[in-house]
C-alpha cells in the first residue's frame, strides 16, 4: 500500500494545471476586455457627456441682466428711469457664524431688526450657494463704512444694481405703473410663455400700467459671461462674454406738465380726466385721483403700507380713468341724437313739447325732467343745448333698447377701448340678453327710458366717454386712444400705428354736425347749460355736461346736496372739445360725488385754457358743484 501511493500521476496533474491556467487566462482576458470596452465607452463614446459634466464643475455661466428701457413723455422728459443702488449681500455657506456676522453688521451698515427678518425670510426660500440680500439701498456712507471693514466679513459683499425710479411720484402712477420683485406667479407665467430663461438675473418685472403692457419692449435680452471657477466656487478667469441687449426706450403721448397741472386741479377729489388729440387718438393726459407713490412698490412695499392703500375708502389703487364705471348720464345725448337721426326715428325738425315730465304710453309712470317746469317746445338742437331729458326719453322709447344698444356699442360703450393698458373695464351697455342673464328677468319698456339719458343699467368708463367723443368729432371715424407714441430701435424712432376700424354710420350724413352744433350751444348760447363757463373764451368750445345719480329720488322730492351724505351726492361729468371748427383736444371728466373743489365746468375751462392759451389764470364761478345740481345736466 505504501509503495503504491508513493507513485504520482504527473500527466493528470499537468493536464489539470493547464486547464486551470487556461480558465484563469480567459477570465483575465475577459475582464481586460470589459475594462477596455468600458474605457472606450468613457473616453470615446461618452467623451462629450463627461467633458460637459467636468466643465459644469469648472465652468459656470453667469447671467448679466439687461438695462431696462427708459420711458419718456412726448417732449423727451424721462418719466421712469434706472439709477444705481447698492445692496449688502451674504452667501451663508461662506460664513462661519451667520448670526454673529449679522450682529456685527448692525453698527457698520445700520442693520435693523426688519432687515435681519427679511434676510432670514429670503434665506429660507433660497438655494444653497446663492447671495442673499441683507440690506438694500445703501447710502454712500454705509458703503464706505463697509469697504473699510470688509476684511472682517468673508462671504459678505456690496453689489451694485440698476433699480427703477419714478421721479414724479404719484402724478403718473396710473399710467406708468411700476415694476416690483418677480414672484412665483410671474415665474409660472414666464415659464409657460417660454420667457423664463431671459429673466435669469432679473429681479423686477412690470406689474402695472405701461411697465406691464410693454414689458417685452422694455425688458431687453439677458447676456451672460462664461467663467472658470475653482473648487471653492471662486472665479479664476473669464472665458467668454455675451453682452446683454438693453431694453428699448419708449416715448409716450403724454404731456407731463399738463398731467401735473390737472392733478393740482383735482386735488382732494375722487376724480378722473382723460385728454386726447382727436386727430390721432393720442392721450395727452390721463389723471386719476387720489393716487399713490409707485416707488413704494419697487423695493417691496411693507404690509402696513399696502394695507393702508388697500383699505383706503378713497381707493387710490383704482385707475378711475379706465377702471371706474359710472352712468355716463347726459354726456351721451349727442350720440343718442346721431343714432336716432341715422335710424330715421327723428329729423332735425322733430319737435316735442316738454311740460317737465314724460309719461310712458299705456302706463301711469312719469319720468321727470331735471327742470321741473319744463323746457317748452323742443327740437333736437335745443334739447341738446338745454339737456332736456324728456326729449331723449321719447327718443329712447321710439328707438327701443335693441337699436339703442346696437348704436351705442358702435360708439364703443360696453367694449374695451383698445388703450394700451391692461387695467381696463368694459362697463355695461345693457341689452335684453344681458338683463335676462344677470337678473333672470325680461326687459321691460320702462327699462329703456333712462338709458336714453345715460342712466339705468348703463355704465361706462371715462376713457370710453372720451373715445365716443372723438368718434363724434371725427364724424364717425374711429380713433383708438393710445399712450405709446414711438419706440426706439437702433437709435431711430418707430411710431405707433393707428389700427383701422370701420366707421360709425354715414360719415357724410350731416347728422354729426347737428349733434356738434348742439354741444356748441351748450357752451356758447344763452340757453346752454354750461354757457357761463365757456362763452367768454377767446376760442370756441363745444361741451356736454351730465349728472349721474347715485341714488334715486322719491316722487316730487327735490335734490339737496346739503341734506345727504357726501358719498350719496350726484357724480358730475363733462365732455368738451376745442377749438370748435378745428378740434385739437377732446376732454372727458368725472368728479365723483361732485368733487371737493370748483364746479366741473370751471375745471374743464381751466384745462382747455391751459392747453389752448398756455395759461392757468382762468377766473370763473368756483362754487362746489354739490350745491347746485340742476344746471350741470
Task: Pin down the residues of each PLM region.
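Periplasmic/cell-envelope proteins involved in peptidoglycan metabolism and beta-lactam response
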Residues: 1-303, 325, 347-348, 402-412, ...
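Beta-lactam-recognizing serine transpeptidase/beta-lactamase-like catalytic domain environment
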Residues: 2-11, 80, 229-239, 279-331, ...
Amino acid at each position: 500500500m505504501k509503495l503504491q501511493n508513493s507513485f504520482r500521476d504527473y500527466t493528470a496533474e499537468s493536464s489539470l494545471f493547464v486547464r486551470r491556467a487556461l480558465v484563469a487566462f480567459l477570465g483575465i482576458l475577459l475582464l481586460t476586455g470589459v475594462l477596455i470596452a468600458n474605457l472606450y465607452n468613457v473616453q470615446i463614446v461618452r467623451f462629450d457627456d463627461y467633458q460637459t459634466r467636468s466643465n459644469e464643475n469648472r465652468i459656470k455661466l453667469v447671467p448679466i441682466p439687461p438695462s431696462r428701457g427708459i420711458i419718456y413723455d412726448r417732449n423727451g422728459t424721462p418719466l421712469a428711469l434706472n439709477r444705481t443702488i447698492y445692496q449688502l449681500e451674504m452667501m451663508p455657506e461662506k460664513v462661519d457664524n451667520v448670526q454673529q456676522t449679522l450682529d456685527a453688521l448692525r453698527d457698520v451698515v445700520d442693520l435693523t431688526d426688519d432687515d435681519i427678518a427679511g434676510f432670514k425670510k429670503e434665506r429660507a426660500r433660497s438655494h444653497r450657494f446663492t447671495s442673499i440680500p441683507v440690506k438694500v439701498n445703501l447710502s454712500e456712507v454705509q458703503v464706505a463704512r463697509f469697504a473699510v471693514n470688509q476684511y472682517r466679513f468673508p462671504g459678505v459683499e456690496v453689489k451694485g444694481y440698476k433699480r427703477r425710479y419714478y421721479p414724479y411720484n404719484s402724478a403718473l402712477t396710473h399710467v406708468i405703473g411700476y415694476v416690483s420683485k418677480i414672484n412665483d406667479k410671474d415665474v409660472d407665467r414666464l415659464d409657460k410663455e417660454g420667457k423664463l430663461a431671459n429673466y435669469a438675473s432679473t429681479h423686477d418685472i412690470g406689474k402695472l400700467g405701461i411697465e406691464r403692457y410693454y414689458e417685452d419692449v422694455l425688458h431687453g435680452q439677458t447676456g451672460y459671461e462664461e467663467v472658470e471657477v475653482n473648487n471653492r466656487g471662486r472665479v479664476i478667469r473669464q472665458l467668454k462674454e455675451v453682452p446683454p441687449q438693453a431694453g428699448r426706450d419708449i416715448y409716450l403721448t403724454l404731456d407731463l406738465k399738463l398731467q401735473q397741472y390737472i392733478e393740482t386741479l383735482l386735488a382732494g377729489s375722487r376724480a378722473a380726466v382723460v385728454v386726447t388729440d382727436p386727430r390721432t387718438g393720442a392721450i395727452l393726459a390721463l389723471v386719476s385721483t387720489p393716487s399713490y407713490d409707485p416707488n413704494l412698490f419697487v423695493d417691496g412695499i411693507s404690509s402696513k403700507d399696502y394695507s393702508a392703500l388697500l383699505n383706503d375708502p378713497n381707493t387710490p389703487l383704482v385707475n378711475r380713468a379706465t377702471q371706474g364705471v359710472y352712468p355716463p348720464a347726459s354726456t351721451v345725448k349727442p350720440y343718442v341724437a346721431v343714432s336716432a337721426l341715422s335710424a330715421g326715428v327723428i329729423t332735425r325738425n322733430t319737435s316735442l313739447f316738454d311740460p317737465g315730465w314724460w309719461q310712458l304710453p299705456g302706463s301711469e309712470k312719469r319720468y321727470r325732467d331735471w327742470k321741473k317746469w319744463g323746457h317748452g317746445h323742443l327740437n333736437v338742437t335745443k334739447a341738446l343745448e338745454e339737456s332736456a331729458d324728456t326729449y331723449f326719453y321719447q327718443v329712447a322709447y321710439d328707438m327701443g333698447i335693441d337699436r339703442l344698444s346696437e348704436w351705442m356699442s358702435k360708439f364703443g360703450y360696453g367694449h374695451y377701448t383698445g388703450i394700451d393698458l391692461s387695467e381696463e373695464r368694459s362697463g355695461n351697455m345693457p341689452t335684453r340678453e344681458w338683463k335676462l342673464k344677470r337678473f333672470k328677468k325680461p326687459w321691460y319698456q320702462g327699462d329703456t327710458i333712462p338709458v336714453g339719458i345715460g342712466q339705468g343699467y348703463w355704465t361706462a368708463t371715462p376713457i370710453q366717454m372720451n373715445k365716443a367723443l372723438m368718434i363724434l368729432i371725427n364724424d364717425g371715424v374711429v380713433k383708438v386712444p393710445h399712450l405709446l407714441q414711438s419706440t426706439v430701435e437702433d437709435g431711430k424712432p418707430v411710431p405707433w400705428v393707428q389700427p383701422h376700424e370701420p366707421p360709425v354710420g354715414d360719415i357724410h350724413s350731416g347728422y354729426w354736425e347737428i349733434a356738434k352744433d348742439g354741444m356748441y350751444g351748450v357752451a356758447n348760447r344763452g340757453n346752454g347749460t354750461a354757457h357761463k363757463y365757456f362763452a367768454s373764451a377767446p376760442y370756441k368750445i363745444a361741451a356736454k355736461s351730465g349728472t349721474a345719480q347715485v341714488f334715486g329720488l322719491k316722487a316730487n322730492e327735490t335734490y339737496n346736496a346739503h341734506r345727504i351724505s357726501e358719498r350719496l351726492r350726484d357724480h358730475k361729468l363733462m365732455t368738451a372739445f376745442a377749438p370748435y371748427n378745428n378740434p385739437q383736444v377732446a376732454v372727458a371728466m368725472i368728479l365723483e360725488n361732485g368733487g371737493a373743489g370748483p364746479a366741473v365746468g370751471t375745471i374743464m375751462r381751466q384745462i382747455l385754457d391751459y392747453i389752448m392759451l398756455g395759461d392757468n389764470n382762468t377766473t370763473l364761478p368756483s362754487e362746489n358743484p354739490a350745491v347746485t345740481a340742476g344746471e350741470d345736466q
